[in-house]
């Protein structure tokens, strides 16, 4: 059986659902295909959903700053009815501890241009603002079994604080909100089905074939399949001209009780998200009683690259839990390290430079929103608009490879050069971590 539509979006995570919404808003007929049973059931469900602006590229900072304005007015962004439960943005701030390989100036030079407010704290102010935090400098990160792990601090740390940062409380609900908004604009979703073939004719995509045999005829196909994006690219026969590689990477985020009084730093407010590349971890509030603890890929840690993202266990391991939570306890001396791991694991779709690819491909009509590298949840509201600008421009005849398109942001008015996310780019400036 053959069905016809304008666009097929493969993947209904927070990125794919945003793309579906914006393309449907533009008047196109959109069908979304996803292997799971609902929006945000893949990598999105394991996201820490941190909203921060500390990217080493100007395009990254502009995208995150614009996206903040979408999260702050989430119901308006979605045009959601009054009774619909929505994910909520928690403005608790983000505090980035000093580290030599990513100095404050790497970010503040962009903040000054874009208009992102920030504060630079010395060690004394950091201690006064966050008294539960050990301000010692311990760089470089070490395995927790290393004899030097508990060595005395070599100096004291300051920090870069962005008061407008924070996190979204329910990343999966955010994806479902976007999917529901897309459906209100006419998009349809096919759950629990996979693409088995990308159909093409004369150098142009003409649709996809689903596992039950249905063919979806479409002039545009968007790959937003997360860690499964490489498999879909291979089905489409694209990727030969990419200058950045992509690989699935399994990651864990752990759940622990917060130290007593940790959140008592601002009345009813929570403590900020703490990004600690000095020890190789980050710490995010989870309500007022708990914390989420993740890693920042320090060089001393082996990374769990996967050939097949389906091979990644969704359960946290004792070894990673012990490593990450012990590092967090070094920074927060009041934190206890439980014996039993608790948390989630997911698979990132990681590029060589930890920067996403939002681009066309050598197959006309086949577009990619991939390589999100664990740091693009925050930008999801904008990515749908970036991809709509890209698709409308290229399908209208613009040669994006020769002259990159520009997207003008609705809220901030900032122009974003889409060439920054090109598949053919030179490797972007990067910390070499999930921070981008």
Where are these regions (language model features)?
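Core beta-strand elements of the Rossmann-like FAD/NAD(P) dinucleotide-binding domain
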Residues: 3-5, 210-220
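Active-site substrate-recognition segment that forms the wall
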Residues: 21-25, 49, 75, 83-91, ...
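Glycine-rich FAD pyrophosphate-binding loop
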Residues: 25-44
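Dinucleotide-binding Rossmann-like beta1-alpha1 core, especially the glycine-rich loop
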Residues: 48-146, 280-282
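C-terminal lid/capping helical subdomain adjacent to the catalytic/cofactor pocket in oxidative enzymes
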Residues: 120, 362-436
């Amino acid at each position: 059986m053959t069905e016809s539509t304008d666009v097929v979006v493969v993947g209904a995570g927070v990125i794919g659902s945003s793309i579906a919404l914006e393309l449907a808003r533009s008047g196109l007929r959109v069908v979304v295909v996803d292997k799971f049973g609902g929006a945000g059931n893949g990598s999105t469900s394991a996201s820490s959903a941190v909203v921060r602006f500390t990217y080493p590229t100007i395009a990254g900072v502009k995208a995150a700053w614009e996206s903040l304005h979408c999260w702050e007015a989430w119901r308006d962004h979605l045009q959601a009815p009054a009774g619909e439960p929505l994910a909520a943005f928690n403005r608790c701030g983000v505090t980035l501890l000093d580290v030599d390989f990513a100095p404050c100036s790497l970010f503040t030079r962009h903040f000054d241009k874009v208009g992102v407010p920030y504060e630079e704290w010395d060690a004394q102010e950091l201690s006064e603002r966050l008294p539960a935090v050990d301000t010692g400098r311990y760089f470089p990160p070490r395995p927790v079994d290393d004899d030097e792990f508990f060595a005395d601090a070599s100096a004291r740390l300051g920090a870069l604080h962005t008061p407008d940062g924070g996190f979204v409380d329910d990343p999966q609900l955010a994806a479902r909100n976007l999917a529901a908004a897309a459906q209100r604009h006419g998009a349809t979703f096919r759950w629990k089905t996979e693409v088995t073939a990308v159909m093409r004719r004369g150098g142009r995509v003409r649709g996809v074939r689903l596992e039950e045999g249905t063919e979806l005829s479409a002039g545009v196909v968007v790959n937003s399949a997360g860690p499964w994006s490489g498999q879909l690219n291979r089905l489409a026969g694209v990727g030969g001209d990419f200058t950045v590689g992509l690989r699935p990477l399994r990651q864990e985020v752990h759940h622990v009780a917060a130290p007593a009084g940790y959140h008592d730093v601002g009345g009813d407010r929570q403590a900020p998200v703490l990004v600690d590349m000095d020890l190789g971890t980050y710490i995010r509030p989870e309500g007022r009683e708990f914390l989420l603890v993740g890693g920042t890929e320090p060089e001393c840690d082996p990374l769990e690259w996967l050939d097949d993202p389906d091979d990644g266990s969704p359960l946290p391991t004792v070894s990673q839990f012990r490593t990450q939570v012990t590092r967090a306890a070094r920074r927060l001396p009041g934190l206890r390290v439980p014996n039993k791991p608790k948390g989630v694991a997911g698979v990132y779709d990681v590029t060589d430079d930890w920067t996403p690819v939002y681009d066309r491909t050598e197959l006309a009509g086949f577009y990619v929103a991939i390589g999100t590298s664990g740091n693009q949840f925050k930008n999801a509201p904008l990515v749908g608009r970036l991809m709509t600008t890209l698709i409308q421009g290229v399908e209208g005849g613009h040669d994006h490879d020769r002259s990159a398109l520009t997207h003008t942001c609705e809220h901030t008015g900032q122009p974003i050069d889409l060439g920054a996310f090109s598949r053919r780019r030179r490797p972007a400036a990067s910390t070499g971590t999930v921070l981008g």
